[in-house]
Amino acid sequence: MSIYLELTNEFNADGLRAILSSGQAVVLHRLAVMSKDGDWILRESPEALDAIRNVLDRRCAHYRYGAPLDVRWMRGGWSSHFEFRLDALRVRTDFVTRPPRLTADDLAGLWREQAGCATPVVDPRRLAELKKTNREKDYAVIGELTRLLDDPRQQFLLSRSAQDLMALARTHPNLARQLATARPLLEQAGRSVEALEAALDAERRKLMHANERRLLRYMTAAEPWAEHWPAVAAEIAGLPLRQAHAVVTARAEGLLPFELPDGIP
């Protein structure tokens, strides 16, 4: 069992608190052999975050640059990052409670669906939304995740393959026309492969730029915190996580806003 599955089990030892996401979720869906970091979506409650920090404390984890694992920041869409050593392996863990591009209703549905699962993991459809990042490689992953879906509506909205979309349009022409309002490039699905591929490329660039703008808003808001972080990191070096957390939280107050001025992008 990988360390990331072990951690997932520990996080959820006495109740569902953490759902495996991002690269490790891609591994669990058998679309990758490995991923170097671990990402989780956490329940947004002080009790859940306390439990996660306790697990990390037992692993002798330390904070990396990011927001404190505190509900005041997490509800603003910030992320928290930690690291620990396991023999020769450097284990990095990343956490959010409000992942990008998932609505509140969709996130609530994810928690309902994963209740009782042996290994809670983000499903392919939602994972495809999370993978709409500014990294080129993630769009190939979205394409493969879409091929795991059975619902033609979801396939139309997420597929990255011109060939797949044209085949779908031949099978479901009315649905393709209906969904063209939500995804305009579907208007090209009955034309040429070249036109549809060009539309897919343009859409990918648009999605990448949108995520770049989202990240820039957080980076700009975090500039005072980033400036002070080296001193904070030196202050907490060698401290147990439970003590380091108190220091990080106290130092972040007033430097890192709980929420962005215009809300979560």
State each model region's role.
Residues 1-265:
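Compositionally biased terminal segments of proteins
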